[in-house]
Amino acid sequence: MPWPILCRDLLLAALPAIAACSGLHDEMTQYAALGPRYEARTWLATNANPYPLASNRFESATAGAAFVDSLYALGADTVYVMNVQEDSAWVAREGGPYADALLIRLPDTPESRQSLFARGAREARAEGFEPEADHDQRYLYLWWD
């Protein structure tokens, strides 16, 4: 087989893997731009703010923690808090940092993914947003306005 054809065939065979890596990198870069993220259970357990998570959705830290626990029960690999307000003025005024978003690292199992996307869809619709569809992404982002 001539060299240019062999190179073309190898490149064509590798394109799906390259595209998958590129998509994951883009997804990770997108969320990294939103600032630091912290594992949600730990962050909530150590936060002195009485309303640390999306106070327009969760009436207390306990309610926010129960929601995070429900995501883990549905099969989330990891749940992170995002959009964290943690500057010293905010912390002094509120008693601790505040976040209004969660980032769910999705599992590979189809049943768990389906359950997490269904939960995400309910939250999105309640906020007036279009639910995100499962297109084999690694993360699901929830934000409360």
Where do the PLM segments sit?
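Intrinsically disordered, low-complexity regions enriched in Ser/Pro/Gly/Gln/His and often acidic
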Residues: 1, 36, 135-138
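Bacterial N-terminal signal peptides that target proteins for export
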Residues: 1-10
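Sec-dependent N-terminal signal peptides
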Residues: 9-18
